[in-house]
Amino acid sequence: LFPPYHDPFEEETFIIGPYYTQRAVRRSPFYFTEREKHELMVATAILTLAFAIAFTGGLRGLIFRWRSFILYLVVAALAVITAFALHEIGHKFAAIHFGYWAEFNYFMPGLFIALLFSLAGFLFAAPGAVVIHGYPTRRENGIIAAAGPSVNLALGIFFFSLSSGLNSFAPLAGLLFYFVAAINILIGAFNMIPLPPLDGSKIIAWSLPVYLGMAVLLAIFLFFIYF
């Protein structure tokens, strides 16, 4: 079921699938397998394309507004890298912090659906998730789940502040960062919906105060950005 992995931290160790030594994980908390890097890059590229097509107006916009598509491609790349890729990496590093093997796996049917929806001018995606091998406690699971939306919240605040500072003398850059902030806050807020398999369901099962605190913060910034 799982292909063999060679431990990048202990040359003499040969690892099978999820049975990754905690000693190696703790020595280098930033490990990525070759397959994982490939799948994360593929998922990011496909999502970037889907976002750009949807923002252009779908297939019709792609045909008649191809110059706009090129601009949206740049914007979408920054938005997807920060709002999606760093969100997933946040989950991964939080899991590694607790000593678990964690690896991003893409979901190709979900990525294909994202492309199909984008041609109609809409966005719906199930790009994949970080798979954790082990049995985290409710607390650990809640913290791991909270890491993703927390990354989105932090990046949203950062890019929103950057946008506000640039608006007066670099309005185009300000608009770009405003857009990236909006996508981060939107994705963070969506993931806080307390329904499985979204992050919110795991956070609320661990700590209602933490869930409410994060949800309120995201709701406040969602209001400021979109209204």
Question: Where in this protein do the model-derived segments appear?
Answer:
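Hydrophobic transmembrane alpha-helices and their immediate loop junctions
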Residues: 1-227
